[in-house]
Structure formats: C-alpha cells, structure tokens
C-alpha cells in the first residue's frame, strides 16, 4: 500500500470520526453541558433570591420586633396611666367618704350639743324655779339673795 493512500484513508477515517462525533456525540454533550450550566445558573439565582428573601425576612422580623416593643411600651404606659387613674379615683373616693363621715360626725356632735343645751335649759329652769322658791320662802335680804345667787351660779 502506498503511503499516500494510507494517509488519505486515515484522513478519510478521521473526517468520518469528526463527522460522527459532530453529529451524534457532540450535540448531546453540548446539550448536557448547557443543561448543567442552566441548572448551575438557576441554582445561583435561587441562592441569590434566597439571600434576598432572608435579608427581607430579617428586616421584617426586626420591624415586627420593633413594632411589638413599641406596642408593649404603649400597653405598659397605658397600664401605668390606668393604675394612676384608679389610684386617683380611690383617693377621691376616700376623701369623699372621709368628708361624709366627718359630716355625719359633725351632725351627731351638733345633735348632741343641742340635746345637751336643751338638758341644760331644763336644769337651769328647774334651778331657777327652785332658786325662786327659796328666795320667796326667805325674807328679802340682800346678803341672803347674794348667797343664793352664788349658790345657783355654782350649780350651773
């Protein structure tokens, strides 16, 4: 065999091999590579989206926590205000009750004083009548009258 023919046959075989590889093997291989690249790109995009979603979720969590703290502080402030209102109402109620008790006591004191005055008037009138009787029974004498009046004054 001639060397030219051998080179030509090998060139033809090589060309056939290139054609078979280019038509039968290369397209599925390129398709597999492209699919793999696409999957990798999708994975990277998903990772980026996940990181963004995580960052957004973290921001939202921080915002919700901030709102919760604000609301908790508002609730605590409202509770303190309500407690102060209740304390003030209790103080006012206690003052009103004390005033009412004071008025009742004052009314009772006034009534007792009035009864005591009436009792004193009765006793004074009895003493006056008794003194008048004694004066009328004795002779009219200035010294005796003075002694009787002093005695009445001591009794009063």
Curated annotation (Swiss-Prot):
The keyword Cell membrane is assigned to this record: yes
GO molecular function: proton-transporting ATP synthase activity, rotational mechanism; proton-transporting ATPase activity, rotational mechanism
InterPro entries membership: ATP_synth_B-like_membr_sf (IPR028987), ATP_synth_b/b'su_bac/chlpt (IPR002146), ATP_synth_F0_bsu_bac (IPR005864), ATP_synthase_B_chain (IPR050059)
Keywords from the UniProt entry: ATP synthesis, Cell inner membrane, Cell membrane, CF(0), Hydrogen ion transport, Ion transport, Membrane, Transmembrane, Transmembrane helix, Transport
Transmembrane domains' residue ranges: 3-23
Localization in the cell: Cell inner membrane
GO cellular component terms, semicolon-separated: plasma membrane; proton-transporting ATP synthase complex
Pfam families: ATP-synt_B (PF00430)
SUPFAM superfamilies given in the database record: F1F0 ATP synthase subunit B, membrane domain
Domain of life: Bacteria
Oligomer and partners: F-type ATPases have 2 components, F(1) - the catalytic core - and F(0) - the membrane proton channel. F(1) has five subunits: alpha(3), beta(3), gamma(1), delta(1), epsilon(1). F(0) has three main subunits: a(1), b(2) and c(10-14). The alpha and beta chains form an alternating ring which encloses part of the gamma chain. F(1) is attached to F(0) by a central stalk formed by the gamma and epsilon chains, while a peripheral stalk is formed by the delta and b chains.
Job of this protein: F(1)F(0) ATP synthase produces ATP from ADP in the presence of a proton or sodium gradient. F-type ATPases consist of two structural domains, F(1) containing the extramembraneous catalytic core and F(0) containing the membrane proton channel, linked together by a central stalk and a peripheral stalk. During catalysis, ATP synthesis in the catalytic domain of F(1) is coupled via a rotary mechanism of the central stalk subunits to proton translocation.
Protein's recorded name: ATP synthase subunit b
Species whose genome carries this gene: Xanthomonas oryzae pv. oryzae (strain KACC10331 / KXO85)
Lineage, opening ranks: Bacteria, Pseudomonadati, Pseudomonadota, Gammaproteobacteria, Lysobacterales
Gene: atpF
């Amino acid at each position: 065999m001639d060397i030219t023919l051998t080179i030509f046959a090998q060139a033809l075989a090589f060309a056939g091999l290139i054609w078979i590889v280019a038509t039968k093997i290369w397209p599925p291989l390129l398709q597999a590579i492209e699919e793999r690249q696409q999957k990798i790109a999708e994975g990277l995009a998903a990772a980026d989206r996940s990181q963004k979603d995580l960052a957004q979720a973290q921001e939202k969590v921080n915002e919700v926590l901030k709102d919760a703290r604000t609301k908790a502080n508002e609730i605590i402030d409202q509770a303190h205000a309500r407690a102060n209102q209740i304390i003030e109402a209790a103080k006012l109620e206690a003052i009103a009750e004390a005033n009412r008790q004071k008025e009742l006591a004052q009314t009772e004191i006034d009534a007792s004083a009035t009864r005591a005055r009436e009792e004193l008037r009765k006793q004074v009138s009895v003493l006056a009548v008794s003194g008048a009787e004694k004066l009328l029974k004795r002779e009219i004498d200035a010294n005796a009258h003075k002694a009787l009046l002093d005695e009445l004054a001591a009794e009063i």
